[in-house]
A protein has these predicted regions:
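Accessory carbohydrate-recognition regions in carbohydrate-active enzymes
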Residues: 1-150
Length: 150
């Protein structure tokens, strides 16, 4: 089996009142300290990703074992172009096409339509490498610390 053919979105079409597996589209290395996933909403608690959403809020560094258990010590970082009216996820989020993105255990690739950004995140044992291709002249990165320490 070729690991590049695995789509990590399987089992992720969940809500608090209906489960299709309660999985998240994690990208990481086996026994890694952290995992990464795209965040598509910050309005649904522990269900912060849905495969049918077309909004990309950023890459989430997560420790969430299950939506029912919640996340801890997480944060979201978003590639941006130019200045934002406010430093919020709402102002930094962008639309994206899930069908043109790569959701793989070894890497995530997202094309942000509003900002003209293509980014690829490759995980490592303790972190990861984020490659960002900007198609405009004003590059940046918004770190949004949404830390919830229980």
């Amino acid at each position: 089996m070729n690991i590049q053919h695995i789509d990590t979105r399987h089992g992720t079409a969940n809500q608090a009142n209906f489960s299709n597996g309660n999985c998240q589209p994690y990208t990481g290395v086996p026994f890694g300290m952290n995992y990464f996933a795209p965040q598509t909403t910050d309005q649904k608690g522990s269900w912060w990703f849905h495969p049918d959403d077309h909004t990309f809020q950023g890459y989430r560094l997560t420790h969430q074992p299950s939506p029912w258990m919640g996340d801890f010590s997480y944060f979201v970082f978003t590639p941006i172009n130019g200045l934002l009216p406010e430093n919020t996820l709402f102002h930094a989020q962008s639309s994206y096409r899930p069908e043109e993105s790569t959701f793989c255990p070894t890497h995530l690739t997202i094309n942000q339509l509003r900002d003209g950004i293509r980014s690829t995140l490759i995980p490592s044992m303790y972190g990861g490498v984020l490659t960002i291709d900007y198609y405009k002249n004003e590059s940046g990165l918004l770190f949004r610390f949404l830390v919830n320490i229980n």
